[in-house]
């Protein structure tokens, strides 16, 4: 017994000596160190505690049931706003019944066909939330395993209409607490003007409400029908999660929602094996002060989102013209709201939106100072250095254009780079574990991931003054 105790003492002494020999300089980081111990801890806890053992999971299959059918047919639904408004939409939802009436346009029908309803990325709800949605009330609890949404295809691209970039499906038993089922798979025959998004689950889930979230690609998305297949049942099935899921709320403006940065982030993390769910609270040109003000549309929406959902992370991004004197008072109000929700506040150190490339380093320096000071003052240890990554990429790979045609907003390429920086910063995802390329050439995507890593490890060489 004494020998065992002595051996254990020697082991602990060896470990202590080793740890003491490691200096802070052994770890290279950006200007603010990132402590991901909470993330690792949560992943470990989830794998051992939160995920139910496979043998305890309720596994019900329903496709062979004689009553299996599209249970959303002719059911009532709610949708987000149309464009330019619900009173005079360009592509209306006649009588609020077209999306579940069972009537589909032909594969050759025009986008103006009466079976289509149009969602636009410039509608108020889309700008605020980052998606348009249709929420079907099935009237009572059902067991469900297949979800379909019919949309116009990319055949209409010449007029600014395309298939959605993605359709994500959620279910709820009460219309308040939502469970994300996942992203639907796009199917479309060659030459067809009608496509569909399909999501099938291995086993049935229970729900009375089904929500289809449509994330845009071009400005317009034409939606023809939504379906949910299953059977009526009063048995509630506990929702099963096979992996840990982190929920993120992104607060900001077009620097966040242009080219769907949060959804690119979601695809990147999931390609690396980390499940995420994203929600937006954004508005074009918005300042954080407007979200902190509970009397504004943005402030009211943020309060609603914080009251309805517990988030793991809340990402904060301010207007390009904001300096510390603007951001600090807003953060004084926002941080207590974030902490009350139980979320971890993190920062998106924005890139320069100056349309003159020669002025971008000095403009980015202003953001660098502002966000780093905010991080220090509010003890925020995760500050995604997107500003650094843009400048590093411009230095190393000047042929890669990160900006949109307006030379101010980021492009789809810039969105991918931004999302990579956030995935690596917030969730400690390794550059080599990311397999999603966002339809970019593999070598270009690899270069962007490299720039993201460099931005996090060493940062851009900003001048001290």
Residue ranges and their predicted role:
Residues 364-456, 460-462:
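Catalytic His-Asp segment of secreted/periplasmic serine-dependent ester chemistry enzymes
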Residues 58-68, 238-271:
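N-terminal module-boundary/linker segments of secreted carbohydrate-active enzymes
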Residues 18-37:
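Sec-dependent signal peptide cleavage junction
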Residues 247-249, 257-330:
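Conserved SGNH/GDSL esterase-like catalytic core that processes O-acyl groups on lipids
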Residues 59-69, 104-182, 193-240:
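Aromatic, loop-rich ligand-recognition surfaces of beta-strand-rich domains
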Residues 9-18:
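Bacterial N-terminal signal peptides
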Residues 60-109:
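Predominantly extracellular/luminal regions of secreted and cell-surface proteins
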Residues 336-345, 380:
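A short helix->loop->beta-strand "cap" motif at the edges of active sites that frequently abuts
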